[in-house]
Design a protein with these regions (language model features):
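Bacterial Sec-dependent N-terminal signal peptides
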Residues: 1-26
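Signature for phosphate-centric chemistry
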Residues: 24-148, 152-323, 328-342
Length: 342
């Protein structure tokens, strides 16, 4: 009898373990609130100082950066949310939480009008901070010499560049600066605009079927129901999911424009992680190398070659600049990191 009980206990334990293993969802993540902002996240505040041995002397810097924190890149998500919330209000389905979101969304619209996509005060401070730390960490390069800086034509990238070099100039006005901005820099800073293979890749939409499959299975709609109400006429389930993503985009982007908002007021941790995963997968499939195609990463080839050439020239003493600065976008960094296997 005792042996039978022991055997039964072992079988039950094994069954529990096996059910746990098979029930585990590999896409179930537990990132914190800040991490779930993805590329909408501002630069981290806590920065570890860079140190190098006394035996080494910095000889050249090649810098590729994203623009600083900004207002929402367009009004699309805010306006989609406004339309849905206003309709829910008129139909009487809106919840008290929905009214809170309506006020918050209207505040974002008011703050962003005529500034959509522009660098904000936080973004300017981020660039000044990076510039200050760079000069302090690699002071031998900043006693004199030339700083060469380029940016994409985007106003937020351009302003990031000027905030950066302006701070360097304030710290040492003996430095010389050469700056360049505009579409002339698109092959390096916005290759996704000009690379024919990539444009064709996006047009063909090979990334879309796997994304749509994931999106339909993992995008939660419970959060949007809590603001619009269960009886709100969402239309089809796809439209409901798109509204859920619009809510995510608006809330996840608020810290970049210094608007105070606790996402956990509107999402559970699991919902926020799931919505982020949809946002993240879309970027992964569109902006990096995957089993679908290497084209999204290959577009960074010209930038990699430019980094190599300017570094080689610095080593050979033929690069007039002691520092090369480049200011682009998250969509500039993702292909670059992918191509370099970072």
């Amino acid at each position: 009898v005792h042996k039978m009980k022991r055997f039964s206990s072992i079988v039950v334990s094994m069954a529990v373990v096996m059910s746990t293993v098979f029930a585990a969802d590999p896409t179930d993540t537990h990132y914190n609130i800040s991490e779930c902002q993805g590329s909408l996240r501002p630069y981290p505040v806590n920065v570890v100082p860079v140190q190098y041995p006394d035996s080494l002397i910095p000889v050249h810097i090649n810098h590729v950066g994203r623009h600083g924190a900004r207002y929402p890149s367009s009004a699309a998500n805010c306006l989609a949310l406004r339309t849905a919330l206003s309709r829910a209000d008129s139909l009487g389905t809106i919840t008290s939480l929905g009214r809170d979101l309506m006020k918050l969304n209207e505040h974002v619209i008011a703050q962003s009008t005529d500034r959509w996509g522009a660098l904000d005060s936080l973004g300017m401070a981020e660039q000044r901070g990076i510039a200050s730390r760079m000069l302090a960490n690699y002071l031998p390069l900043f006693t004199d010499g030339t700083i060469d800086a380029i940016s994409s034509y985007s106003p937020r990238a351009m302003m990031s560049m000027y905030c950066f070099v302006h701070q360097l100039d304030r710290l040492n006005n003996k430095l010389e600066f050469i700056t360049s901005t505009g579409r002339v820099n698109s092959p390096l800073m916005r290759p996704f605009d000009v690379d024919k293979d990539y444009i064709e890749f996006r047009k063909e939409g090979t990334w879309k079927p796997p994304y749509d499959e994931y999106f339909s299975g993992h995008c939660p709609t419970s959060a949007i129901e809590r603001v619009l109400g269960g009886s709100f006429p969402y239309g089809d389930v796809q439209a409901k999911r798109e509204l859920a993503m619009a809510e995510y985009y608006v809330i996840a982007g608020m810290s970049a424009m210094s608007v105070s908002c606790d996402p956990l007021k509107f999402f559970t941790e699991a919902e926020y992680n799931a919505l982020w995963s949809c946002f993240n997968l879309r970027q992964y499939l569109q902006r990096t190398a995957s089993t679908l195609s290497t084209v999204p990463a290959d577009i960074a080839g010209a930038l990699v070659l430019d980094i190599i050439n300017t570094t080689d020239a610095a080593v050979q003493g033929t690069n007039p600049a002691v520092v090369n600065l480049r200011f682009g976008h998250a969509e500039t960094i993702m292909p670059l990191a992918s191509l370099l296997h970072l």
